Amino acid sequence: MNSVPSLPGQSVAAVVVAGGKGLRTGGPVPKQFVIWRGKPLLRHCVEALEAAGIAPIVVAIPAGWDEAATQALAGISMVRLVHGGATRQESVKAALEVLEGDAPARVLIHDAARPDLPGSVIERLLTALDKRTGAIPVLPVVDSMVRGSGDAMGETVAREDLYRVQTPQAFHYPAILAAHRAWQGEALAGDDAQVAMRAAHEIALVEGDEALRKVTFASDLEEQSMSVIPRTGMGFDVHRLVEGEELWLCGVNIPHGKGLSGHSDADVAIHALVDALLGAIAAGDIGDHFPPSDPQWKGASSDRFLAHAGTLVTEAGYRIANVDVTIICEAPKIGPHKAAMRETLARILGIDSALVSVKATTTERLGLTGRGEGIAAQAVATVVSG
């Protein structure tokens, strides 16, 4: 995602509203912390804002859920947490006041329950702020509309002037902060545009996106997950153990009397994982992209191969949902290094370590790995669209 358009001095911050209990999804955990597509729902929208170059990002969370929020957003810089209030409006006001010392020119206010956030919507909103105090994304109403009284149909309502309102909503920061402070609470504010309108600010309408669908019920999580198309690839590799070489496994240097022999650094685990990722998107194998006959790859770090495979996955329109690597050897012991291996693979691929599994097994002293002549590895990678 490209950085958001801005003029010199026109800094852009964001508020993410995650202060509700969100229990209508049917579970014991607020929906913003529910794992969806491999990550907490909250993390999806915060990462989208971060990728757009927006900072700082203030997240309003429910009291008592600090640890869950910290874990959900681990590794994301420029994020601040604040406890939300009894209403959405109170939560937004508290978050806006956290930004007062930064004095951003503009601010986006977004619901954590809308995990898919296209960068194009952000761009349209901020462009609209050149002419108006606020801007909101909307979509047309396509169904017929009627008023009702209980189970009885009333008058028909013309849909031509009706819109479905989404978030994020964009505002000049000083104006929306003042509007929230002036809000008297005589009625619950449905969104921040209502607060701004009450303060006599003009709000622009920009084109929204169906991807910004709000997650409210458990069925919403299921329906959005069904739109994801998974693909799976497998990889396998083996290298001989020799004297005088360093041993690299999953990007981690392992102290051992021998190392693996190969054209690159012979990281057998990464090689298997690269093939699994390439297989998932039907992009050939590691030899197609990094032929051993090419001298430029002699002694090369296998990190480069894995990073390239990850880039190809993204360029093909997919994202990594899970990778699982099994290292097959009698020695060295893999257990003490598993955590470092997971973190290293996650860092290279730019994904959460929760999506990375590293295991080890032996062949009960059978075959070349059992005799200590080599190390093998197999990997499975799942990628999903959307």
Curated annotation (Swiss-Prot):
The record marks 159, 214 as: Positions MEP for the nucleophilic attack. Keywords: Isoprene biosynthesis, Lyase, Metal-binding, Multifunctional enzyme, Nucleotidyltransferase, Transferase. It catalyses: 2-C-methyl-D-erythritol 4-phosphate + CTP + H(+) = 4-CDP-2-C-methyl-D-erythritol + diphosphate; 4-CDP-2-C-methyl-D-erythritol 2-phosphate = 2-C-methyl-D-erythritol 2,4-cyclic diphosphate + CMP. Residues 231-386 are annotated as: 2-C-methyl-D-erythritol 2,4-cyclodiphosphate synthase. 4-CDP-2-C-methyl-D-erythritol 2-phosphate binds at residues 237-239, 263-264, 285-287, 361-364, 371. It comes from the Bacteria. A divalent metal cation binds at residues 237, 239, 271. GO terms for biological process: isopentenyl diphosphate biosynthetic process, methylerythritol 4-phosphate pathway; terpenoid biosynthetic process. GO terms for molecular function: 2-C-methyl-D-erythritol 2,4-cyclodiphosphate synthase activity; 2-C-methyl-D-erythritol 4-phosphate cytidylyltransferase activity; metal ion binding. Pathway: Isoprenoid biosynthesis; isopentenyl diphosphate biosynthesis via DXP pathway; isopentenyl diphosphate from 1-deoxy-D-xylulose 5-phosphate: step 2/6; Isoprenoid biosynthesis; isopentenyl diphosphate biosynthesis via DXP pathway; isopentenyl diphosphate from 1-deoxy-D-xylulose 5-phosphate: step 4/6. Gene3D superfamilies: 2-C-methyl-D-erythritol 2,4-cyclodiphosphate synthase, Spore Coat Polysaccharide Biosynthesis Protein SpsA, Chain A. The record marks 24, 31, 263, 362 as: Transition state stabilizer. Its EC number is 2.7.7.60, 4.6.1.12. Pfam families: IspD, YgbB. Its cofactor is a divalent metal cation. PANTHER family: 2-C-METHYL-D-ERYTHRITOL 2,4-CYCLODIPHOSPHATE SYNTHASE, CHLOROPLASTIC. NCBIfam families: ispD (TIGR00453), ispF (TIGR00151), PRK09382.1 (NF006899). Bifunctional enzyme that catalyzes the formation of 4-diphosphocytidyl-2-C-methyl-D-erythritol from CTP and 2-C-methyl-D-erythritol 4-phosphate (MEP) (IspD), and catalyzes the conversion of 4-diphosphocytidyl-2-C-methyl-D-erythritol 2-phosphate (CDP-ME2P) to 2-C-methyl-D-erythritol 2,4-cyclodiphosphate (ME-CPP) with a corresponding release of cytidine 5-monophosphate (CMP) (IspF). In the N-terminal section; belongs to the IspD/TarI cytidylyltransferase family. IspD subfamily. In the C-terminal section; belongs to the IspF family. This is Bifunctional enzyme IspD/IspF. It comes from Novosphingobium aromaticivorans (strain ATCC 700278 / DSM 12444 / CCUG 56034 / CIP 105152 / NBRC 16084 / F199).
